[in-house]
Amino acid sequence: MKFKKFGKTLLMIAISGGVTLGITSCVQSFTVGYLYVTGTNSSASASNAGIISGFKIDHNKGNLTPINGLPVSSGGANPGRAVLLTGSRFVYVLNRGANSTDGTPNCTATNQCSGANISLFAIGGNGILSQQGQTFFSQGINPIRLFADTAGNFLYVLDSIAPDSTSCALALGAGVTSCGDITAFKIDPTTGRLTLVVNAQVTSASGQPLPYFPVPANPIDFVLASSFIITLSGTPATGDAVFPYTYSSASGQLTVNQNSSQPLNIAQATAIISASGSVWVLDAETASYTVGGTVQTAPSWIFQSTVGANGALQPAVSGSVPGPPTVTNPIYLIPESKSVVERKLIEGDRLVFGPKSGNRIKKRLVG
């Protein structure tokens, strides 16, 4: 596997399945950066224990060389997404924990994940990762996603289930009895330590600010787009929808400006990303379309929108685009500097790469 020459930049991509790509500048060096991959221990006795492996990226050819001293423990079980802060030496890993039945992160309200946490690491010399003795916890149940804002000031975690169902109606409207949530943290730029950002808009029945921000039930993914954090949620039975919060870059605060979700008229969405001024939603539904009078079938669709008033998605002129005919069960999209690439992840496949500033990556992995 090779990377093209990157130049002096820092970039990170974290996707579902636990993928982290970190590029750091190394002037006058044969190493242009480091790539980190999260996964689980292959030992049968520790099959769910999380680990982080790492590679040096060769300056000229992009060849990968294992970093001495890695892998290290991720600080928990079944690591999922990870975040490398732009311009920083800190890495945050979301360990999703494990259920009590088979030890996987496939958790529900009745079979919850235990041991879920966010572990903090610092990048040292030669790309070595050292855990900082700091472990943080989201406020909800069964965390599934996390990202940092573009400035690296705030970290957000998407939880499958809010800790208190009575709070759902307070933010989402009367009659709502179940929901997920977003936990927000402020990042200390010196230590990397996380401090909880409480909900300044919604208070609990006791009059205390909620320590989280409710989102519609069955959340799938979320994204920062323009001045909104948009959550994608739903099931094949109920259909998929998006729900926006107005985002403050100064305080990290999220504010509800509409209580209802926006239906997308799709039912198997797997990802939402923001790139090049657009929002892209990946739908894993098979559907037919006509080209030149010929009916063709696509196993997935990519929907492009722009963000309108109050965070509502407005369909782009190009509308929907059929996914590659050979890619089934896609789960993520990768933004590249001039295009969006659909990505299929198979079991155990946890390594991808995407865009960089400056020169384009010439080679992309698809399928």
Where are the model-predicted features located?
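Sec-dependent bacterial lipoprotein signal peptides
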Residues: 1-26
